[in-house]
Amino acid sequence: MDKSKRPFLKSKRSFRRRLPPIQSGDRIDYRNMSLISRFISEQGKILSRRVNRLTLKQQRLITIAIKQARILSSLPFLNNEKQFERTESTARTTGLRTRNK
């Protein structure tokens, strides 16, 4: 068949299948902080299943484990990086303010 007759065929690209984020030996548990921390955003939110590439059952178990860890104070509910930064106290240079009438 001539190439001009089939202009919309795409060439087949080989692709490498991604490794699953949770291996078969990993235990989904609230004590397994190294595993849980991979599924939390920088702000402390639980990442969605589409982002994590987890199955429905795995996502449910991860969510439960994260919530248990938060309740038991292993994880913070909010991850505010502002609280860890040192805030410089600004000294008041002006004395008493005078009212302009």
UniProtKB/Swiss-Prot annotation:
It comes from the Eukaryota. GO terms for molecular function: small ribosomal subunit rRNA binding; structural constituent of ribosome. Pfam families: Ribosomal_S18. The keyword RNA-binding applies. Keywords: Chloroplast, Plastid, Ribonucleoprotein, Ribosomal protein, RNA-binding, rRNA-binding. Transmembrane segments: none annotated. GO terms for biological process: translation. The keyword rRNA-binding applies. One of its GO terms (cellular component) is chloroplast. InterPro entries: Ribosomal_bS18, Ribosomal_bS18_CS, Ribosomal_bS18_sf. It is found in: Plastid, Chloroplast. Belongs to the bacterial ribosomal protein bS18 family. PANTHER family: 30S RIBOSOMAL PROTEIN S18, SMALL RIBOSOMAL SUBUNIT PROTEIN BS18M. Part of the 30S ribosomal subunit. This is Small ribosomal subunit protein bS18c. It comes from Vitis vinifera (Grape).
